[in-house]
Amino acid sequence: MGDWSALGKLLDKVQAYSTAGGKVWLSVLFIFRILLLGTAVESAWGDEQSAFRCNTQQPGCENVCYDKSFPISHVRFWVLQIIFVSVPTLLYLAHVFYVMRKEEKLNKKEEELKVAQTDGVNVEMHLKQIEIKKFKYGIEEHGKVKMRGGLLRTYIISILFKSVFEVAFLLIQWYIYGFSLSAVYTCKRDPCPHQVDCFLSRPTEKTIFIIFMLVVSLVSLALNIIELFYVFFKGVKDRVKGKSDPYHATTGPLSPSKDCGSPKYAYFNGCSSPTAPLSPMSPPGYKLVTGDRNNSSCRNYNKQASEQNWANYSAEQNRMGQAGSTISNSHAQPFDFPDDNQNSKKLAAGHELQPLAIVDQRPSSRASSRASSRPRPDDLEI
């Protein structure tokens, strides 16, 4: 019972990893081939060599004539056919077991990370990597599996090899036996003294089984072809619908906005903030931030920003007691951003930097006033 339960679990897992055509193919394989081969066909060919008679008494003549007529028994030929046809499926099952093993490891690691997460450890990146690996192997929630990636390629290759083996064995059977058996076979081979006639037992019954196995092989081949086209067109349909990797958007690089010319700063209107050239009468080291000049949607905002910057700078200097005429004159002419790059270059090159004189407005003390009015020996006479 243990072996049957293990086989049942294996078949259940294969059903989960197969398409509808694959499930039908497995049913045909196990019911109409293996089961029929082990019951009815074996009994029909049980007395094949013993019932093969020739009209001669020469020892060894019947054996050589049987070997010439049937190089390999039909039963053993069909056993080899089932083995070769099942090998691609076994390779696919090996890949399934590999995915199952990966699923167990990933689930165990995910549980450990979730336990660590409850203790306050930041494991979001590791959990994300586990989710990406599960998607890569086709593992989904609640044990569901979607055929994709390497598993899908293995499945397609197995279908191709099964189809090739089916066609090859059909051609070999047609070349060796044909698809029917005759009641009398003529043989002329040593040590037979002359040409002898040999007789086959139950030729009609065996012909019926041969035709039945031929039909089963053709049905299996048709199922493989239908399944191959189904998988191919389903993949094309998924691509047409635009189904992509859901983790691609989160793991891929983010593209910058079209309205932003520089990734340094981003304002509410989508304008960037490259450094503007120095204006006339601006102090050394002072820079204004403006938007992209080539972007017409940002020009009004850049003018307002520059005017506000100058107003703030004027207020700050006035609070410090600096003469406001210079600032007011420079502020009276706000920045303009013409579309012509040549005019902007002339404007930037036509003005030189003029440092502002810092005047100390603190009241002088009495000592200093006396010292300033007292003549000193090194003073010059005018």
From Swiss-Prot:
Residues 317-382 are annotated as: Disordered. The modification S-nitrosocysteine is found at C271. PROSITE patterns: CONNEXINS_1, CONNEXINS_2. There is a cross-link at K144, K237 (Glycyl lysine isopeptide (Lys-Gly) (interchain with G-Cter in SUMO)). Residues 317-332 have a biased composition (Polar residues). It is found in: Cell membrane; Cell junction, Gap junction; Endoplasmic reticulum. The modification Phosphotyrosine is found at Y247. The chain crosses the membrane at residues 24-44, 77-97, 156-176, 208-228. Residues 2-23, 98-155, 229-382 are cytoplasmic. Residues 362-374 have a biased composition (Low complexity). It is a multi-pass membrane protein. GO terms for biological process: bone development; bone remodeling; cell communication by electrical coupling; cell-cell signaling; heart development; microtubule-based transport; negative regulation of cell growth; regulation of apoptotic process. One of its GO terms (molecular function) is gap junction hemi-channel activity. This is Gap junction alpha-1 protein. It comes from Oryctolagus cuniculus (Rabbit).
